[in-house]
């Protein structure tokens, strides 16, 4: 089972070591294809899930991640990284954790392909968050990092920009 996210998008230096150093010369960072990797702290759990998904005696996988875009994204990334092929995949969509609701969800499980648009929207949202965060954090840090650190009388640090962070904190 997944315990939250097991897979994440790779940092720019995984594409090319030149991106490890923050510089205006390497911006904007816009990869043609996105790279993913297992989150180091959950590698053991990923290997367990990968082993279960790829068991030869399993022909149907019931996807029971949270019912929503993020749950869909979590499973699709794990299946992608685990190399799941040739299995029937059914999506269990439930609104509560009662036994009755869980049984209904299993009985009425749809082919995973019925949720392809939801999956596509999740991948798109993740790519947008990634590109905005990587590029704007680097631009603002390179341009204003020293000024902000001097003003706050703190050690130089990155200025983080993100979709959720920016609106929640009012930045």
For every predicted segment, state its role.
Residues 1-138, 167-170:
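Intrinsically disordered, low-complexity regulatory segments
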Residues 129-171:
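Prokaryote-biased recognition of long, low-complexity C-terminal linker/tail segments
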